Amino acid sequence: MPFIIYFYIMGHCISIYVMNKSELRSEKINSVLENKTNKKEIKWTELSEGILATTHIPNIREFGKDKTIAKVSTDYFGGNGHQEAKLFVNNKKQYDKSSEFDWSVRPINDVLKSMGIVAKDGQDEFDTVGLGKYRLNSDFK
C-alpha cells in the first residue's frame, strides 16, 4: 500500500481519449455526462474548457467519424518519463508525437492547442483543462 500512495503522489500514468464536448450532438450530451450507459455508450469525465475524457472507446473507428479525437498518454515518476499524443480528424491521423526521445516536445499541449484550448495565465494547456488532477486511469470515473 505505501508504494501505491507514493506513486500517486510522485507519478502520472494515464492513457485516455479527449475531445471537445461540442463534437457530441446536443441531445446526447446530458446522457453522456450523466453516465447513463448501455453496452455501446461511453463513460466520459468532463474536464475544464469544454473537454471530455474517457479511458475507453469501444469502436473508435465508428465513433470517430466526423469528429476530432485525441489519444493522449503520460508515463512519469518523480519527474522522469514521457508523454505521447495523437490527433485524429475524421479517423485520419493529423499528429503523432512523443517526448520519449525529445523532451523539448510537448505533444499533449500541442494537441490541446489544436483542439482550441488556450492556456490560462501561469498554466499550460494540460493544466488549463485539469489533466494534472488525474494521476491514473482509475481517476476517470
Predicted regions and their residues:
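Charged interaction segments
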Residues: K40-K141
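Residue-level marker of intrinsically disordered, low-complexity segments enriched
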Residues: P2-F3, F7-Y8, K67, M115
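Short, extreme N-terminal segment that most often corresponds to the first beta-strand
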Residues: F3-K36, F140-K141
